[in-house]
Design a protein with these regions (language model features):
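Positively charged n-region of N-terminal signal peptides that target proteins for export
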Residues: 1-4
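Bacterial N-terminal signal peptides
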Residues: 9-16
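Ankyrin repeat arrays, specifically the small/polar loop and inter-repeat linker segments at the C-terminal end
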Residues: 20-45, 57-58, 65-75, 91, ...
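Ankyrin repeat A-helix N-terminal signature
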Residues: 50-55, 83-89, 116-122, 149-155, ...
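Acidic (E/D-rich), amphipathic helical modules within compact regulatory domains
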Residues: 108-111, 115-116
Length: 245
């Protein structure tokens, strides 16, 4: 009788231990990793980013419980923040920032996430990223490229958001052009007027020595020319000389 009781107790203990092994402890990263392994879920950046793409925050939480580094990029160079920002997925973007993700990162093309967001033109996303960048202590001077992109693509609303965040509106790009030059070169009236109303220098020269009005004249934009002249813009002697040649 005693042997039977001992056997039953041993069987019960074995069953209990087996049950413990199958139970995941969300507070134990190793336990969560064992669970993922058992479920044949790869504990990789590619997998985590795919969850971000599909807005699966439950699975993302599982990875974070297993001590996944939230900013890791997938094989294509995009991390979860880059993907969420590009797709305009505010739910996932907020989730990521609330769980410690950084905004001051690059995407798979080597562009800063804020620059890509400005190019996409999603105001809500841009505002959220700017808030996060401020929390991270990123200087507003680092937003110069985003301003150039907004001016180049004629996104006056993006210029306004960036200006409100303290971004420099007169930073010269590597090509020698300022935002006002790009706005005019590409015929972006609203972007140009926003910059003028913000008090930028309308007679600043580009790296080639041409003024803003020179570019408006060269490209043939009557509406822009009229507004620039009203704001006090002038042509340069160099432009008249070169245009005759």
């Amino acid at each position: 009788m005693n042997k039977k009781i001992l056997a039953l107790c041993a069987a019960g203990l074995l069953f209990s231990m087996t049950g413990c092994e199958e139970t995941m402890d969300p507070n134990d990263p190793q336990s969560v990793r064992r669970y993922l392994t058992k479920k044949q879920i790869g504990f990789t950046p590619n997998q985590f980013v795919s969850y971000a793409v599909n807005s699966d925050t439950a699975k993302m939480t599982l990875f974070l419980q297993a001590s996944f580094e939230i900013d890791q990029p997938a094989d294509n160079g995009n991390n979860a923040v880059a993907i969420a920002a590009n797709k305009g997925n505010m739910m996932v973007l907020n989730y990521l920032f609330d769980h410690g993700a950084k905004a001051n990162v690059q995407n798979g093309s080597g562009d800063m996430v804020i620059d890509n967001a400005v190019s996409m033109g999603n105001k809500e996303v841009v505002v959220r990223i700017l808030e996060q960048l401020k929390k991270e202590g990123v200087a507003s001077q680092n937003l110069a490229t985003a301003v150039l992109l907004a001016a180049k693509t004629g996104k006056a609303d993006m210029l306004e958001v960036l200006a409100d965040a303290g971004a420099p509106l007169e930073a010269r790009g590597p090509d020698g052009y300022l935002p006002i030059h790009w706005a005019v070169k590409n015929g972006n009236f609203d972007a140009m007027m926003f910059l003028i109303n913000k008090g930028v220098d309308v007679n600043v020269k580009c790296g080639q020595g041409y003024s803003v009005l020179d570019w408006a004249t060269n490209e043939g934009y009557p509406r822009l020319i009229k507004a620039l002249k009203k704001a006090g813009a002038k042509n340069t002697k160099q432009y008249f000389k070169d245009s005759k040649g």
